């Protein structure tokens, strides 16, 4: 059945108007030279960790597979430099867990693996999902979800709409914005391959209205009869509101459909993919080169020259910052990701991971943590919650460790977007409490 295109976005509940701080939107992306050494942790995605398939002393190329897993929800990891495996050791991840990591010393040559070649012709959903897995692709929007799982649509689900996510609602982050401007034709090539294999006849490129140049560029390409002969791809301009790029929020804004609690976009006939993931798939199908590089926004008041950088995965944060001119002052807060949903880290010796789309360094003023006061029951957190939850109650019962009430209040539906804490006049640390509450619920479930 023919699908109509929305003329304007549908209304969604909640959200917050956060400051944009898109300082690097109009700065051309630079490519960073290879570092002397990279660190590749075995957990760079949602799902089972990988196991090293190389050993100390092995020579590797750019694109050589260094780790994999037999688990279904997992993706292989590839070297982003040519050189020699120095060692395999435990490293601490941003979340605090210790995992194995492959350490590779670069020879500076960046020689591509001779075994790398374009995948065989892809004609089926399973072949597309297998190719996505073999490429090492995870969602490049920041979540790190296994892209092959999305593309391997169950037989009982019919996808009629592909939504390309260019919302990029997090403050500071502009890597998707630059992808749209610099690789628009590649994005359209990826769209058409996915569209053809999944038999989708409506593609919505959803982008916030604070990116007028990217909207113009994508619209120009999508309106080109040579690129879109059947007029099945349209650009939808969204209101700039956080968290517009969250999957369930985006599906509702772009189609008017509501993804059920605990459900997926496929349950309502939608597939959501980040623009970077779509563009990468097009490149992979053309060249066979797996995911080894990542465009990262480097910004914050403590960064000398904020910009977008193509970084070899596994490069230390410190080296990326040095490439951007170093620090203007001693950073008081380092964040991997955006300021709303990113992870604050204690050292810049951590490596850039596949899902990292931002590295932020802030001085003392921006890093200042306000002291919370008593909840005044104003209801702003309820109005802001895009999932229609009651964050104040979730915080209260999390502090009490009341698992039954937390389950009744549907705590696991929370996406931890931070709208509640951002909107709270009492500066309550609501998201922190909810994360603890989720831990208590999972711990209780594990006992049964």
Where do the PLM segments sit?
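Ferredoxin-type iron-sulfur electron-transfer modules in oxidoreductases and energy-metabolism complexes
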Residues: 356-372, 382, 386-448
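Acidic low-complexity segments
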Residues: 87, 92-145, 150, 154-156, ...
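Gly-rich Lys/Arg/Thr-decorated short loops/hinges at beta-loop-alpha junctions or inter-strand turns
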Residues: 112, 139, 162-176, 302
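N-terminal, Lys/Arg-enriched amphipathic/low-complexity engagement segments
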Residues: 1-53
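Histidine-anchored nucleotide/phosphate-binding helix
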Residues: 181-197
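Hydrophobic alpha-helical positions that pack around
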Residues: 200-317, 323-328
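Short, well-structured beta-strand-loop connectors
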Residues: 55-68, 87
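Conserved hydrophobic positions within beta-strands
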Residues: 83-85
């Amino acid at each position: 059945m023919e699908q109509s295109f929305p003329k304007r976005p549908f209304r969604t509940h909640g959200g917050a108007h956060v400051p944009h701080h898109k300082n690097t939107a109009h700065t051309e992306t630079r490519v960073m030279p290879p570092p002397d050494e990279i660190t590749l942790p075995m957990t760079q995605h949602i799902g089972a960790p990988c196991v090293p398939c190389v050993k100390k002393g092995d020579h590797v190329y750019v694109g050589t597979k260094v780790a994999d897993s037999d688990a279904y929800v997992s993706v292989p990891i590839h070297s982003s430099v040519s050189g020699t495996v120095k060692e395999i050791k435990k490293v601490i991840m941003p979340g605090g867990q210790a995992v194995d990591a492959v350490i590779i010393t670069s020879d500076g040559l960046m020689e591509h693996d001779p075994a790398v070649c374009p995948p065989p012709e892809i004609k089926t959903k399973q072949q597309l999902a297998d190719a996505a897995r073999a490429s090492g692709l995870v969602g490049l929007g920041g979540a790190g979800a296994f892209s092959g799982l999305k593309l391997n649509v169950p037989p009982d689900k019919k996808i009629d709409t592909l939504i390309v996510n260019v919302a990029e609602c997090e403050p500071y982050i502009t890597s998707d914005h630059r992808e749209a401007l610099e690789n628009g034709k590649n994005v359209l090539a990826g769209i058409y391959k996915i569209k053809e294999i999944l038999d989708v006849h409506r593609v919505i490129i959803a982008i916030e209205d604070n990116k007028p140049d990217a909207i113009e560029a994508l619209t120009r390409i999508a309106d080109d009869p040579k690129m879109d002969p059947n007029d099945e791809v349209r650009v939808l301009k969204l209101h700039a509101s956080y968290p517009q790029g969250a999957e369930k929020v985006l599906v509702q804004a772009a189609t008017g459909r509501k993804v059920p609690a605990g459900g997926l976009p496929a349950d309502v006939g939608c597939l959501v993919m980040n623009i970077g993931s779509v563009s990468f798939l097009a490149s992979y199908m053309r060249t066979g080169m797996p995911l080894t590089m990542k465009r990262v926004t480097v910004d914050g008041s403590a960064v000398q020259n904020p910009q977008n950088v193509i970084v070899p995965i596994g490069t230390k944060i410190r080296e990326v910052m040095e490439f951007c001119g170093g620090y203007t002052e001693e950073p008081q807060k380092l964040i991997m990701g955006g300021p709303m949903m990113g992870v604050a880290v204690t050292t810049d010796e951590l490596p850039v991971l596949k899902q990292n789309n931002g590295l932020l360094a802030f001085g003392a003023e921006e890093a200042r943590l306000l002291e919370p006061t008593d909840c005044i029951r104003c209801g702003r957190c309820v109005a802001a919650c895009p999932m229609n939850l009651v964050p104040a109650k979730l915080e209260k019962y999390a502090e009490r460790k009341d698992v039954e009430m937390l389950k009744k209040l549907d705590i696991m539906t929370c996406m931890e977007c931070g709208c509640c804490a951002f909107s709270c006049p009492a500066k309550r640390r609501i998201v922190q409490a909810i994360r603890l509450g989720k831990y208590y619920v999972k711990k209780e479930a594990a006992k049964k």
